[in-house]
Design a protein with these regions (language model features):
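Active-site-proximal specificity loops/subdomain of glycosyltransferases
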Residues: 2-63
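Extended charged low-complexity segments that act as oligomerization/scaffolding linkers
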Residues: 5-23, 99, 121-125, 138-157, ...
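Short, high-confidence coil segments that cap the C-terminus of an alpha-helix
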Residues: 65, 104-108, 217
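Short beta-strand-to-loop acidic/aromatic patch adjacent to the donor-nucleotide binding site
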Residues: 65-82
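Conserved catalytic core of nucleotide-sugar-dependent glycosyltransferases
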Residues: 78-189
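Acidic donor-binding loop at a coil-to-helix junction in glycosyltransferase catalytic cores
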Residues: 198-207
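Active-site donor/metal-binding and catalytic loop motifs
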Residues: 202, 218-241
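Terminal low-complexity segments of carbohydrate-biosynthetic enzymes
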Residues: 230, 239-336
């Protein structure tokens, strides 16, 4: 890449440079504080997903980058495919090139899916469908209910497919035209508390997808899934019942989806009363999952949703402050 273009590696380190630059261009102190500091970091050692990705966006902005491509620590430029004899093997892909090709077609944002073990590990119990409906993940119901056959492994079937318009954006497989930041919303995912324990909502990339669905930006699926080592020990099959790490991952995925759902129900103009049936399904599915895993944490998912709903006013405040600060930064930076 360096032989063909100017390449910069954006690393998340200290924010001293960003603080100085924002101060120089006239961003208010309150906005700088909102963009660079999060109370969860010092108090609990947690960084909200959206906050982290915005740090990378700002560093790329201040570096003068034209295109930013996210490379998460748990992905590799490979895809899983089946051989003619049915075995699964990894195949190297031109991940960076695929994103740059999509951006060269005029896209503001390029994205695609993942290859590897899904966040839903292999399982088989009554209540799987209820749980996913309660978590607004019903599109995954057939996949999960058949997971004992495919072991939760996502394999790429199509080759050389052409990029297609999409509204689905995944932060770990993402390219951005930096000039689009004038119309692109910031990444955002709120946090909330349950029994004094902080929980991070997922869906930090959902606002970008919503902007694409409203035609504010052009987003392409580059048809290039990237290998995601979900549990950090591929090719070991995830064992939900006997591996506490797998249960932890699923538990925090559930609490993350709950936080996302509560916030985006509000963002899309819905009220909690519209989801009474889903709440019943969440309670039934959570009870079934707790029995299946012998892990009582899952029993509390309905209580955790109630806690998230009580935190909605605070989530809205987090969002409005983040959006206001981000808009001020981009207006100052691109209006120089």
């Amino acid at each position: 890449l360096r032989s063909r273009t100017n390449l910069s590696l954006i690393k998340l380190q200290s924010n001293e440079r960003a603080h100085l630059i924002m101060k120089e261009i006239g961003v208010r102190h309150s906005s700088i504080h909102q963009l660079l500091y999060c109370p969860l970091i010092d108090a609990h050692g947690l960084i909200p997903y959206g906050f982290n990705r915005n740090q990378a966006l700002m560093e790329a902005m201040f570096t003068g980058t034209d295109y930013l491509i996210f490379v998460d620590s748990d992905v590799r430029p490979e895809v899983l495919r089946k051989t003619p004899d049915g075995a699964v093997q990894s195949e190297e892909i031109d991940f960076i090139g695929a994103h740059l090709h999509g951006l060269s077609l005029g896209a503001d944002v390029t994205s695609s899916d993942y290859s590897g073990y899904n966040i839903l590990p292999p399982a088989s119990f009554d209540g799987m469908k209820d749980l996913l409906w309660g978590l607004h993940k019903e599109s995954m119901a057939d996949f999960w209910q058949n997971s004992e056959a495919h072991r939760g492994l996502v394999i790429q079937e199509d080759q050389n497919a052409e990029p297609q318009p999409t509204t689905k954006v995944l932060g770990g497989n993402l390219g951005i035209r930096m000039s689009a930041l004038t119309t692109l919303p910031p990444f955002f995912s709120p946090y909330y508390f349950y029994n004094r324990t902080p929980l991070l909502a997922r869906g930090e990339d959902t606002l970008v997808g919503m902007a694409a669905s409203q035609s504010h930006i052009r987003c392409l699926d580059i048809q290039t899934p990237i290998f995601h080592d979900t549990y950090g020990d591929y090719p070991k099959v995830p064992d939900l019942r006997n591996d506490s790490r797998v249960r932890d991952r699923l538990y925090y995925a559930c609490t993350g989806w709950i936080g996302r759902n509560v916030f985006f129900r509000w963002k899309t103009g819905h009220t909690p009363s519209e989801f009474t049936q889903r709440n019943r399904q969440l309670a039934a599915g959570a009870k079934a999952l707790a029995r299946y895993t012998n892990d009582r944490r899952f029993l509390y998912l309905p209580d955790i949703q109630s806690a998230a709903e009580s935190w909605l006013p605070d989530m809205i405040g987090q969002y409005q402050k983040s959006k206001e600060a981000w808009n001020e930064l981009t207006e100052r930076w691109f209006g120089r």
